[in-house]
């Protein structure tokens, strides 16, 4: 540890009634007050998304099966054969938008919309996504206009494949792309081993990155739902555009090995600044 240094608060919550522990806001309120003067643009939303069907194996994030590897900026997807199972296609996304509008959801998350998913995982690839180039069957402007006509917004997806430096190099361009196309919220993802090597999801370097991404997003009035991030510690009090942390074994595991019934109960009875986003 190097000086000067500030250590975080440590808390002990004691009560004769377990309900008091669950309701305690002490951890949240030990964080610094809100860092933003204007928070009128921050609004939690209910959303549905094009993602579960991929998790369940009914569709794919990738546009084609023809490419064992992708080189962004050089690979021409128009010369490939679509696999016919790409989930983030115009008609499918419009179907989700219609559902959201009918059932009172605010936004529609769309995963797999951007080029690069053919070799995104397990390749230790630095330049894996550019966060601004859609697949041929995903019309960004048309779909955002269609969503707007239905009183719904699209939610952006930034999977980084844990290539963190690549994300930081592109983050301003990615956030500006969102603003230009009507997005105001992003689900970020950090699947896989962290690049650069030697860093870990819960280490200080990555904690600094998560905070950097949230603060940078605020410059563009964008809210962040961080996935594969760290457990909530109340930083959302200081930076309230951090609207979610995926930090618990949630719904997606039901498509894998499943979760025990008691686990589902624990998620809602564990005291913390958890936001309830458990996808």
Predicted feature residues:
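Short conserved micro-motifs at the rims of enzyme active sites and ligand-binding pockets
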Residues: 21-25, 57-63, 236-237
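Single conserved hydrophobic/aromatic residue that forms the stacking wall/gate
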Residues: 268-278
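Aromatic-lined carbohydrate-binding/catalytic grooves of carbohydrate-active enzymes
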Residues: 55-203
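N-terminal accessory beta-strand-rich subdomains and adjacent acidic, glycine-rich linkers
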Residues: 1-37
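Active-site neighborhood of glycoside hydrolase catalytic domains
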Residues: 168-270
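Transmembrane beta-strand segments of Gram-negative outer membrane beta-barrel proteins
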Residues: 44-48
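Structured core elements
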Residues: 10-12, 49, 109, 185-187, ...
């Amino acid at each position: 540890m190097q000086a000067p240094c500030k250590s975080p608060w440590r808390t002990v919550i004691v009560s004769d009634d377990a309900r008091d522990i669950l309701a305690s806001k002490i951890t949240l309120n030990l964080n610094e007050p809100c860092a933003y003067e204007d928070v009128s643009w921050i609004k939690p939303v209910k959303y549905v998304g094009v993602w579960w069907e991929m998790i369940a194996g009914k569709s794919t994030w990738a546009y084609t099966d023809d490419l064992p590897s992708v080189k962004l900026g050089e690979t021409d997807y128009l010369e490939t054969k679509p696999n016919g199972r790409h989930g983030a296609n115009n008609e499918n996304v419009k179907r989700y938008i219609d559902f959201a509008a009918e059932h009172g959801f605010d936004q529609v998350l769309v995963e797999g919309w951007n080029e690069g998913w053919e070799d995104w995982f397990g390749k230790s690839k630095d330049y894996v996504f550019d966060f601004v180039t859609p697949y041929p069957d995903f019309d960004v402007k048309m779909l955002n206009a269609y969503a707007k006509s239905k009183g719904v917004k699209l939610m952006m997806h930034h999977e980084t494949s844990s290539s963190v430096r690549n994300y930081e190099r592109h983050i301003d361009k990615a956030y500006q792309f969102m603003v230009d196309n009507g997005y105001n919220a992003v689900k970020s993802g950090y699947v896989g081993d962290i690049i650069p090597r030697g860093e870990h999801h819960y280490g200080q370097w990555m904690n600094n990155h998560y905070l950097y991404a949230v603060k940078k997003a605020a410059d563009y009035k964008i809210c962040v739902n961080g996935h594969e991030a760290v457990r909530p510690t109340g930083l959302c009090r200081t930076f309230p555009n951090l609207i979610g942390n995926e930090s618990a074994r949630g719904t997606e595991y039901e498509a894998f090995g499943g979760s025990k019934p008691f686990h589902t109960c624990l998620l809602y009875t564990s005291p913390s600044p958890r936001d309830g986003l458990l996808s």
